[in-house]
Amino acid sequence: AFWQGKRVFLTGHTGFKGSWLSLWLASLGTEVKGYALNPPTSPSLFDEAEVGKVIDSQIGDIRDQDALYESMLKFNPDILIHMAAQPLVRYSYDAPIETYEVNVIGTAKVLEVARSCSTLKAIVNITTDKCYENDERSQGYKEDDPMGGHDPYSSSKGCAELVASAYRRSFLQEQGIGLASVRAGNVIGGGDWADDRLIPDILRSFEKSEPVVIRNPKATRPWQHVLEP
């Protein structure tokens, strides 16, 4: 009942997780405005599930602050969910500047626009468990563990967490806008055609009758289904 009639502005709605979230929110009676780049894969869950038919979808770049401002303030959301990101570790080695521009500066621009939105009550900032300084511990990380990251992607997400914390304490608290970060682990589920994902890579190898290549066989990672509450 909480989501019924709520207005949610969702960045990154064309991605794997964003598409599932769009469908779920729409099924709960939420009015969703999506703002994102074109789907990152072909095929994509966004296209196959025809997500654009159940929500208001706008193709745009979070780095374009003017377009983002016009889109968000015209929609007048109650809740902002920020999922747009450059999400790939290996790609971040090839494009570190783009990774920081999207994940750090892009997040700052989203939050800067958000604090101009008079109807906004809450922000959910989606990041990753890779935002922590990796000390190779065998236990899980705690919320107050230090941010860090060895590679450009991971460190960009640590930076994004610091940006969100600064905006919360400097601006959003006094405006009565709540902000929380959600740090996901490895997410699996139907509709994921991205590269460098364990389950899709295994299935692609099976289809081609090729050996399955595990990049980091000694790594221990948390797993969750995309629809897991």
Predicted regions and their residues:
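N-terminal Rossmann-like NAD(P)+-binding domain of SDR-like oxidoreductases, especially those catalyzing
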Residues: 1-184
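Amphipathic alpha-helical segments in well-structured domains
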Residues: 107, 195-199
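A conserved pocket-lining segment of Rossmann-fold NAD(P)-dependent short-chain dehydrogenase/reductase
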Residues: 92, 144-146, 174-191, 201-224
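Alpha-helical and His/Cys-centered functional microenvironments
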Residues: 86, 228-229
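Substrate-binding strand-loop-helix patch
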Residues: 57-63, 102, 188-196, 217-228
